[in-house]
Amino acid sequence: MRGQLKVLKKTPLIFAVPTTAGTGSETTLAAVISNPDTHEKNAINDPVLRPKFAVLDPELTVGLPPHITSTTGMDALTHAVEAFIGRSNVKSTEEAALKATKLIFQNIEKVYEDSKNIEARENMLVASFYAGVAFTRAYVGYVHAIAHNLGGMYGIPHGLANAVILPYIL
């Protein structure tokens, strides 16, 4: 299953509580489904998947190891960059993408070096949220297309694949 408007049944009220600062899932209408048998990762986009409420609690991210913190942060950065340069962006998505990018650059090293820095962790969650808002309207691009294939085929973590590919696509 992949594509637009694929949810055929009524969904329950969705609340999102992210435990990493990267996917932006708490504000998007996208879901990614991995099939380990076929080594595919497919995206579904449907407005019914967008959470109605989100709680951004930085305490839930404190125990993350540095490599998860950095790669999920790079996922958020990639969302913001791809939304900013995408063809479907508008002024509001550009603003959200810029806010996300600024927050990520100001905080990603801080949380990598000090996992208990609550203020930096909160800022990374907010950045991920803004990036999610931006790419929900403007979509992602080539970086994610390649990263999804690498993740599906070879099990490479999504944020790591984004981090490696982003400079080459830019």
Predicted features along the sequence, with ranges:
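Beta-strand segments within the central parallel beta-sheet cores of soluble alpha/beta enzyme folds
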Residues: 1, 14, 121-123, 163-165
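Proline/glycine-rich low-complexity loops and linkers
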Residues: 1-30
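Short, flexible, glycine/charge-rich loop motifs used to bind or transfer phosphoryl groups or to couple energy/partner
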Residues: 3-5, 43-44, 144
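Proline-centered helix-kink/hinge sites
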Residues: 12-13, 18, 51, 58, ...
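Active-site pre-Tyr helix/loop in NAD(P)-dependent dehydrogenases
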Residues: 20, 80, 169
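Carboxylate- and glycine-rich phosphate/diphosphate-binding segment that chelates Mg2+/Mn2+
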Residues: 27-138
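C-terminal catalytic subdomain
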Residues: 138-170
